[in-house]
Curated annotation (Swiss-Prot):
GO terms for molecular function: adenylate kinase activity; ATP binding; zinc ion binding. One of its GO terms (biological process) is AMP salvage. This is Adenylate kinase. Monomer. The keyword Nucleotide-binding applies. Its main location: cytoplasm. It holds the Pfam family ADK_lid. One of its GO terms (cellular component) is cytoplasm. Signal peptide: none annotated. Residues 30-59 are annotated as: NMP. The keyword Hydrolase does not apply. The gene is adk. Residues 124-161 are annotated as: LID.
Length: 214
């Protein structure tokens, strides 16, 4: 099963991707992680990406697509994958379709959450400075305020999670992603999921939607 998971910041993509990966026994591929791995391992594409990043420039599509393609060709992806964070543009989506021409995507899942709810979720998020574990002051608070349950690390709010920045991030995301949503809608593989339900209900809805596409 080859699935793309889409949704704005704060929609819970990471949580759902991990759950789906376990349930379907396919890898969760977060593009940020494979980028960092390619750079740290010093692969040809990783070196190329690093040269752009060091210069403060956007990494060109052909390099991004190359890094994703390298990962999708690994043996653990033969039975499928959950792709999180890619594609971000229609150009990237078209290139991905070419890469997957023999085994096309099963579904593109979009976790839909209202703007107000997303701002509430993002601005309440707190991260552990030591281990990076994520909490929420309202939905998933730590046992002791401001302290991580795992390692007693200090919890902090990321700069891009304050309310004003969260609003800006959402505007940019929604504007850039709309053409991608339409692209997968036109291809007949888009599945919109109500992301305002509990994580367990969202997971069940995603599972039902992707299994119906098999």
């Amino acid at each position: 099963m080859r699935i793309i998971l889409m949704g704005p910041p704060g929609a819970g993509k990471g949580t759902q991707a991990e759950k789906l990966s376990k349930e379907l026994d396919v890898p969760h591929i977060a593009t940020g992680d494979i980028f960092r791995k390619a750079v740290s391992e010093g692969t040809e594409l990783g070196k190329e990406a690093k040269s752009y990043m060091d210069a403060g420039q956007l990494v060109p599509d052909d390099v991004v697509i190359g890094i994703v393609e390298e990962r999708l060709k690994k043996p653990d992806c033969h039975e499928g994958f959950i792709l999180d964070g890619f594609p971000r543009t229609v150009t990237q989506a078209e290139a991905l379709d070419k890469v997957l021409s023999d085994n096309p995507l099963t579904a593109a899942v979009y976790i839909d959450v209202s703007k107000d709810e997303l701002i509430d979720r993002l601005s309440g998020r707190r991260i552990c400075r030591k281990c990076g574990k994520s909490y929420h002051i309202k939905f998933n608070p730590p046992q002791v305020r401001g302290v991580c349950d795992e390692d007693e690390g200090e919890l902090y709010q990321r700069d891009d999670d304050n309310e004003e920045t969260a609003k800006e991030r959402l505007e940019v995301y929604l504007e850039n992603t709309q053409p991608l949503v339409e692209y997968y809608q036109d291809r007949g593989i888009l599945k919109k999921i109500d992301g305002t339900k509990s994580p367990e209900e969202v997971f069940r809805d995603i599972l039902k939607a992707v299994q119906a596409k098999q």
